[in-house]
Amino acid sequence: MLGAKPHWLPGPLHSPGLPLVLVLLALGAGWAQEGSEPVLLEGECLVVCEPGRAAAGGPGGAALGEAPPGRVAFAAVRSHHHEPAGETGNGTSGAIYFDQVLVNEGGGFDRASGSFVAPVRGVYSFRFHVVKVYNRQTVQVSLMLNTWPVISAFANDPDVTREAATSSVLLPLDPGDRVSLRLRRGNLLGGWKYSSFSGFLIFPL
């Protein structure tokens, strides 16, 4: 403020060049180092953070009253070309299975069924890459949300030895929603090992 004069402390803390506000700041710093206690100045509480602790709502911290979002991600592939005897979906129209799980953070991917079950409500990203090898038939692969085909991809060039049906999508899911791949047309005999299926949680809702 214009014309305002600094206030000085009486006694031993009085110094011609030491304004009151600097003395209070110095005292507050000393109290914070000793006991990390709040500093009370004119009825306002100044919270002293603990050293090395992330501030709430800042980088590495969640907002007050909220838990950090869970980490959810999976990636699965085939370890061999042909379906083992006794498995369903052995090259004919049906569910596409993946027997080798590379990542399953959050435990949402079920290897037995080849499907992902959403553990939390949120927006998820999914990607699949399904290959046909030495196969002149058209292959159609659909990504299924429960029983609904969301997107489909095709591999239909008869003149190439290897071709992939590949696509990706973002989906809002509720807990318990199931996402899987289904072979809607053609067969994958000989090309299983080059196929993959992956997904992850982008953010919770």
Curated annotation (Swiss-Prot):
UniProt keywords, alphabetically: Disulfide bond, Endoplasmic reticulum, Glycoprotein, Golgi apparatus, Secreted, Signal, Synapse
One Gene Ontology biological process: maintenance of synapse structure
Subcellular location: Endoplasmic reticulum; Golgi apparatus, cis-Golgi network; Secreted; Synapse
Glycosylation sites recorded in the entry for this protein: 90
One CC-aspect GO term: endoplasmic reticulum
Signal peptide location: 1-32
Purpose: May be involved in synaptic functions in the CNS.
Record's subunit section: Heterohexamer; disulfide-linked heterotrimers. Interacts with CBLN1. May also form oligomers with CBLN2 and CBLN4.
Protein name (database record): Cerebellin-3
Gene encoding the protein: CBLN3
